[in-house]
Amino acid sequence: MTRNPQPDRSKTAPKNAKRDPVASGERDASVNRAASHNYFLLDKYEAGVALRGTEVKSIRDGRANLKDAYGLVKENELWLINAHIGPYDAASYNNHAPLRTRKLLVKKREILKLLAASQQKGHTLIPTRMYFKNGRVKVELAVAKGKQLWDKRETDRRKTADRDAREAIARSRKS
């Protein structure tokens, strides 16, 4: 009579692993699609966000909007301004203000880099996405330079040409 071999445990999670799928990796909570359309994105940085409890729950519900948001270095601290996080429905009277200014958590060295980059002519700090990483809310902040109208048109032309080329290749493969 043969014995069953031991199961392969290399593909299973360890016993103490968190069961929450949000806590086990990265999950986008909000993406600023207008950022790549309106700006040239140069450098990207990851920053933590100082939030209140109801804000985290609203972000988990998908109520974050980064469309008009920007970053600002004030008194050697980095702030996220105009980021809209909708109110949490199940909260009581002490819900958060949707457009409050939120502190971004980065190292002092990165703050100085961001300050130098944002002080260059035409450069600003734009949040490109908000996401969960190991259960914590993070913001991807990009140093950006504004696009002119003709830059936007050129980008649209390039996207259209690339799409047409991909479609032509796909059609030629089918026949």
Swiss-Prot record:
Name this polypeptide is given: SsrA-binding protein
GO BP of this protein: trans-translation
Keywords from the named record: Cytoplasm, RNA-binding
GO MF, one annotated term: RNA binding
Family: Belongs to the SmpB family.
GO cellular component, one term: cytosol
Pfam family, one: SmpB
Alphabetized HAMAP family for the sequence: SmpB
Primary localisation category: cytoplasm
Subcellular location: Cytoplasm
Region (Disordered): 1-29, 152-175
Described function: Required for rescue of stalled ribosomes mediated by trans-translation. Binds to transfer-messenger RNA (tmRNA), required for stable association of tmRNA with ribosomes. tmRNA and SmpB together mimic tRNA shape, replacing the anticodon stem-loop with SmpB. tmRNA is encoded by the ssrA gene; the 2 termini fold to resemble tRNA(Ala) and it encodes a 'tag peptide', a short internal open reading frame. During trans-translation Ala-aminoacylated tmRNA acts like a tRNA, entering the A-site of stalled ribosomes, displacing the stalled mRNA.
InterPro entries registered for this protein in UniProt: SmpB, SsrA-bd_prot, SsrA-bd_prot_CS
Lineage summary: Bacteria, Pseudomonadati, Acidobacteriota, Terriglobia, Terriglobales
Domain of life: Bacteria
Organism: Koribacter versatilis (strain Ellin345)
